[in-house]
Amino acid sequence: MKKTFLGTGIALTLLSACAPKQSQETLTKSGLNPTNYETIVDGVKPVKLYTLKNAAGMEVCVTNFGGRIVSIMVPDKNGNLKDVVLGFDSIADYQNIPSDFGASIGRYANRINKGVIVMDGETIQLPQNNFGHCLHGGPKGWQYQVYEANQLNDSTMTLTMKSPDGDANFPGNVTATVTYALTRDNAIDINYEATTDKKTVINMTNHSYFNLSGNPANPATDHILYVNADSITPVDSTFMTTGEMMAVTETPFDFNTPKTIAPDVTNFENEQIKFGNGFDHNWVLNTKGDINQLAAKLTSPTSGITLEAVSY
């Protein structure tokens, strides 16, 4: 009998003081041509671009190749719509240029030490694709697979992945579902659920890269960041977590008082900044899954766009 073992999510709210200016819609609001995302993978799996929108004028484009968020359009302080995530203009780019832009990562986001897991005394060797570790489910993780898409209405869709027992040597037949839902107040609610018929490991996430200025040529290091966390999980030189927790007090990782990402992001005298080539770590949130507590907040002073994140 299958058992549900995961149900978690994150809500990202993008805030602006202005309503979007009206414009003539030809392609998507982000200028994407949906035909550039239409293809067949593995001879039988159709891929396309899906568009979600809400009454406030927000638009999110998603491809079922990797369950990826391709664009997020929200109004800036002047009412001009801006795309605040990195993405490609065609499905061919996602297939030919290795990246995790916007992807629904699985089976296991981040690294598994030396690619080894132990289940009920059995040692299982997983693919080693990053400094001898298993990163993001291996070289053929879900971010490079085709999800089954179902758009429920203008603002909500589900993406389902069926991963067989032994997929990348992970145990268990797993069915995982990602739900993207836009709310009236410009939040993206991302919910993850999964079932398995065998003891296994799973750790899903979304891998979007945000630049709230709306211009990828502008460095995001001027963004003002708040993170509700008192510690991080430090890493070694292979970027594997050590199993410890490190207090952020009096370190570059302390964002309990909002501050710009620069100059601390390039403080390479700090060993953890050096190992991560900047901020690329896990913050241990104080929120403990409480959706009423803010986990993080990011603001672009250029665009006036703010991203608020909660986790549950």
What are these regions (language model features)?
Residues M1-K29:
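Bacterial Sec-dependent N-terminal signal peptides
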Residues A19-M58, N64-Y312:
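An exposed, glycine/acidic-rich loop-and-rim segment of catalytic or binding clefts
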